Amino acid sequence: MADKKEKLFSDFSPVSTEQWMEKVTADLKGADFEKKLVWKTNEGFKVKPFYRMEDLEGLKTTDALPGEFPYLRGTKKDSNEWLVRQEIKVESPQEANTKALDILNKGIDSLSFHVKAKELNAAYIETLLNDICAECVELNFSTCQGHVVELANLLVAYFQKKDYDLKKLQGSINFDYFNKMLSKGKEKGDMVQTAKALIEAIQPLPFYRVLNVNALSLNNAGAYISQELGYALAWGNEYMSQLTEAGVPAAIVAKKIKFNFGISSNYFLEIAKFRAARMLWANIVASYNPECLRDCDNKGANGECRCAAKMRVHAETSTFNLTLFDAHVNLLRTQTEAMSAALAGVDSMTVVPFDKTYETPDEFSERMARNQQLLLKEESHFDKVVDPAAGSYYIENLTVSIAKQAWELFLAVEEEGGFYAALKAGTVQAAVNESNKARHKAVAQRREILLGTNQFPNFNEKAGEKKPVEAKCCCGGHDTC
């Protein structure tokens, strides 16, 4: 072995930042450096045209290690593995079961069932999950919010009846009290009462998450990245604050929260977003001094449980930028979005089929969506390297910049009284609506590029009967959830 490291490019003398700037200034021929080369992001910060090692000085992000608090570099130490999820809207439990068994043989290891509450009973669950090995696949369920406790009881009873090792089961129930307030301005029931009952009902399944932060809805509504993250943190903290005040231990609350983020096409900023999200959430949870629920080596200086500070993240490609026309271009968008989330170390991911905007996805579009993730795993090996972005001058600086912007927004929401108070006041909705309008205007003026729409559109396309699909809740209605 060599006694010393060989320096690459030793024949070339090093170039200082000053020399780079002199060259850039000369090439600009008098043009303003700030206007020409500095990117003023929608997130509220500026991005330089180049970064160097000196730009890492003072950044604490470079001290982070994979699998260690504050989890900036991911919650896993040995791999970048994530679960490939596909959604199934259950019209018939038998048909849904047949479809689930089929796609489990095609690369899926996480299922998401949208079930109708009015049909829920033990026989329904048995038919739906028949022959599906619950210890081998993550199972996620959505239903009307008023029936989540009933669903939890049915699942626990089913798994116990099947004699599963309950500690090997992973999944979630999509209870989210605040999402309806966000989209409809309506409240239904008592959040604390329902959440406590749900946590109690799901207690036999320690790795099932039942308190959801559906920041995906912000992303799909046109929120900027810093808004999505800042509001998501406040959203999660609202669960922590209200439920700990109601007597639920902080560690239990934290371990029942799941974050569902969207993924926009802003490639590098999305990588930075997920890294910043884990770091900020870990510090929020740590501030509650959660006590370990069992003997654990992963404790902080004050004995707080650092396992509870791990953010569980599901990511889904955005629908904000999916187009009705020239829809196959959506495949390009969702592919780069999936790459961002994979490199950032999410726990599970859904790639939305390219045709979802105008029809129920068919077998072809669903297969394409699955294979987009499988390509990243099996051909590109994105699941093998933990946080490959670590040490990148550019991404480390983006991570810090996004973290600062999101944290400022989080603090502003907390000063307003928390996420619940901000929703009641309409602050969150107004801010996201403004972003939506600004982004639509930017697309119309070609300041935000949407390939196939305002850049290289297909003028010869015959759209036929294409119409936007009208969204419905998981119960099949609009206001019954």
Predicted regions and their residues:
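Catalytic alpha/beta active-site cores
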Residues: A2-N266, E270, C296, C307, ...
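Mobile "lid/hinge" segments at catalytic clefts and subdomain interfaces of large enzymes
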Residues: P206-M240, Q335-L409
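Catalytic alpha/beta core domains of metabolic enzymes, predominantly
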Residues: L293, D297, R312-S318, A327-H328, ...
